[in-house]
């Protein structure tokens, strides 16, 4: 009886092993974070920001549990985006090896820097409002620093 053949890993054109499942999970988690923030901003935020006054009726929302979380929804949404980027920094994904690490690292750093600079220039203006930035106020700094922290996870994979 002969030995069973060894399982050949999936190789991409570059010669590296690529995990399609890990890539798909990273994309799904990032999209889930974006969807979470979008749903909260467009559907549940009115009920979350409602202050009771005589004669006013609380706005209806299909997600009352989401309205109860208030600004924690932003932490969940951005946390999912950061987690998806961290998953994408694994060496079995294209962003986790070779030039992809540099792209992911510099991209995350520059997105974080641009987010903070945009907040400082536009976020405190009374005439111009960016939908998520005008709700987070000083917490925008944590979002920018979060993107930079994700850049460090890419930097740890750099060879």
Language-model features, listed with the residues they occupy:
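Terminal, Lys/Arg-rich, intrinsically disordered segments and adjacent short helical elements
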Residues: 1-28, 43-65
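Membrane-helix interface motif
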Residues: 37-54, 117-125
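Structural signature of hydrophobic alpha-helical transmembrane segments
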Residues: 70-79, 137-143
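Hydrophobic cores of alpha-helical transmembrane segments in multi-pass inner/ER membrane proteins
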Residues: 77-84, 143-154
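Structural signal for the C-terminal ends of transmembrane alpha-helices
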Residues: 86-92, 154-157
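Membrane-interface helix-boundary motifs at transmembrane edges
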Residues: 92-99
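Transmembrane alpha-helical segments of multi-pass membrane proteins
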Residues: 100-115
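Non-cytosolic membrane-interface motifs at loop->transmembrane helix junctions
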Residues: 128-140
């Amino acid at each position: 009886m002969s030995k069973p053949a060894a399982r050949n890993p999936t190789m991409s054109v570059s010669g590296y092993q690529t995990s399609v499942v890990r890539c798909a999970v990273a994309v799904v988690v990032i999209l889930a974070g974006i969807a979470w923030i979008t749903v909260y901003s467009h559907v549940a935020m009115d009920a979350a920001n409602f202050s009771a006054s005589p004669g006013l009726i609380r706005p209806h929302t299909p997600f009352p549990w989401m309205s109860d979380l208030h600004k924690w929804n932003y932490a969940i949404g951005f946390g999912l985006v950061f987690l998806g980027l961290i998953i994408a920094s694994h060496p079995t994904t294209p962003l986790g090896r070779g030039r992809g690490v540099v792209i992911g690292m510099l991209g995350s750093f520059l997105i974080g820097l641009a987010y903070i600079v945009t907040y400082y220039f536009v976020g405190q203006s009374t005439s111009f409002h960016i939908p998520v930035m005008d709700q987070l106020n000083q917490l925008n700094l944590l979002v920018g620093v979060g993107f930079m922290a994700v850049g460090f996870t890419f930097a740890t994979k750099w060879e």
